[in-house]
Amino acid sequence: GGSTMDASKAICAAAGHDGPAWDLVLDNSLVNDALPLMTVNTIAATGSEYDNSAVISNIETNEKLPLASDLLWPVVSFIDPAYTITVLARQTVAGSCDTMSHFMEQYFVKDISPVAEGLIEGILRTVIRNTPVVLENPGDLDARSELLWASTLGCNGIAALGSQASGWPCHAIEHEVSARYDITHGIGLAFLTPRLLRYFLEKAPEFLDRFAGFAERVMGLRADEFDSCEALAEAGLVKLDAFYKSVGVPAAGLAELGIDNTHFEAMAEHVEKHWFAPLEAFPVPFTR
């Protein structure tokens, strides 16, 4: 899974570094050499088997940060859906939610390539269609194959070619949450995504057509059944929320998840200081 593959990437990078491995996480430019890495993926989730980055947590400092270098591409990865059939239902769901978030981060940008738009919409439909299938029948190799192939394409840049770069704001926020609280990454993303997308829609009305297209082409709604684009866009987010709940994502608020505002200021400061992209790179205006 992602944690194992990402830890392996950090070990490969740190093998030739004369100092703590965390140095490399804080300053990715220090990665000057790396051991070759082979991965055998056993869950459809992070896409780390086909990208050059890792996410590393420091439990002593409550930090969860990216480590990226072109020296960290796996030399070879074995991607066999048969290895995923014993994944627990809750981890399968978390993996699908992670996959969806990877693509939505690259979809809700101000300028998207038509090719990327169609690719992402098709992948999102694939994940939404096949996740309930494997929950009902974990041994369905066809559905497992679709989920695994979808997740593998999430973070290697293919889905972003020709589009405006995204600062991946949902991941920036979720990393702060799961760095401090015991929340599975994919579930945290599923909790945050509908809320963040509503913020996008509120702050950037120019996204309305994108949201309407998402509602139609991803969530399967019909535009002629709604009085306005605004109503269609909101219905798409409602249906996204309903999908998450249907596959077992907890319908909870922050309080129910054991999260209060104690660390919000520190978390916001950490995003501003350490995230790989500045706040100005996010698709809509963000402030601490």
Q: Where do the PLM segments sit?
A:
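Short glycine/serine/threonine-rich phosphate/pyrophosphate-binding segments
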Residues: 3-9, 47-50, 166, 170, ...
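A glycine/threonine-rich phosphate-anchoring loop and its flanking beta-alpha core
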Residues: 14-114, 209-210
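N-terminal small/polar loop signature for handling phosphorylated ligands or for N-terminal nucleophile
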Residues: 1-19, 133-144
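Active-site segments that bind and position negatively charged phosphate/pyrophosphate groups
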Residues: 106-239
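C-terminal charged capping/lid subdomain of soluble metabolic enzymes
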Residues: 215-288
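Alpha-helix C-terminal capping segments
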Residues: 9-16, 31, 160-162, 180-181
